[in-house]
Amino acid sequence: MDPRCTMGLAILIFVTVLLISDAVSVETQAYFNGTAYLPCPFTKAQNISLSELVVFWQDQQKLVLYEHYLGTEKLDSVNAKYLGRTSFDRNNWTLRLHNVQIKDMGSYDCFIQKKPPTGSIILQQTLTELSVIANFSEPEIKLAQNVTGNSGINLTCTSKQGHPKPKKMYFLITNSTNEYGDNMQISQDNVTELFSISNSLSLSFPDGVWHMTVVCVLETESMKISSKPLNFTQEFPSPQTYWKEITASVTVALLLVMLLIIVCHKKPNQPSRPSNTASKLERDSNADRETINLKELEPQIASAKPNAE
């Protein structure tokens, strides 16, 4: 093999090993519409001037965010989507990406190259994994209809403009650890890619309960957010209505008592009719016996008449 080829291969292997050994991987997080920090810490900065280096960042699609070429910003190779959105901190070797959007999530590479008279040598590569978060709005409970005597309560809870996708939303009610909710819905904005969530609940006052407190809870991967508590009080009956109900109840009770007395009074009189019939039969029997006795005395009466004459 040609010695020059051998030397070239050795240099290539050396540069590759150097690149792998000096590769750095970091994770960073930014808020939606905020600023992301993409570090590129250079351990050899004390020995090499920035004017001797080429430093640039590119995204996972190989689009250039920023390039610092031998001490000067170079905008020719910067992609249009990143123009005006970046600033370079020379002291910390960090690129600031402004106005971060959900679509900016992903991996970014920073390359530091030395520019010798011929060619270039990669001195360091830093891989940054960027995640973007957006705080959901505080859950808000809205009443769908007014609370009246025995009517149900229809509630809706909403929270908007958050990221990443929420896990769930539910209602909590006084003195209960159960999670309530009838219809949880999650939607995502096509432009901002932020999520909104809502849930609804229909409930009524249990018997004997006059007060209830309801709270809506949004649960994400990292936190729980609660709404302001909403208090409900069922209206007590007015005094006039109360006394009307009492009067009606007492009247019904008296009518029932009177009806019961009448029924009980009639039952013992029913068997008295046969006793009247029996006494009549007894009187008829006595009359018959008297008739029979008179017939037996007729001969005696007849014989006594001549003597009397």
Swiss-Prot record:
GO terms for cellular component: external side of plasma membrane; intracellular membrane-bounded organelle. Residues 269-279 have a biased composition (Polar residues). Residues 269-309 are annotated as: Disordered. Keywords: Adaptive immunity, Cell membrane, Disulfide bond, Glycoprotein, Immunity, Immunoglobulin domain, Membrane, Receptor, Signal, Transmembrane, Transmembrane helix, Ubl conjugation. It is found in: Cell membrane. It is a single-pass type I membrane protein. Residues 1-23 form the signal peptide. Residues 24-244 are extracellular. Residues 150-223 form the Ig-like C2-type domain. Glycans are attached at N33, N47, N92, N135, N146, N154, N175, N190, N231. Residues 266-309 are cytoplasmic. SUPFAM superfamilies: Immunoglobulin (SSF48726). Receptor involved in the costimulatory signal essential for T-lymphocyte proliferation and interleukin-2 production, by binding CD28 or CTLA-4. May play a critical role in the early events of T-cell activation and costimulation of naive T-cells, such as deciding between immunity and anergy that is made by T-cells within 24 hours after activation. Also involved in the regulation of B cells function, plays a role in regulating the level of IgG(1) produced. Upon CD40 engagement, activates NF-kappa-B signaling pathway via phospholipase C and protein kinase C activation. Homodimer. Interacts with MARCH8. Interacts (via cytoplasmic domain) with PHB1 and PHB2; the interactions increases after priming with CD40. Interacts with CD28. This is T-lymphocyte activation antigen CD86. The lineage of its organism: Eukaryota, Metazoa, Chordata, Craniata, Vertebrata.
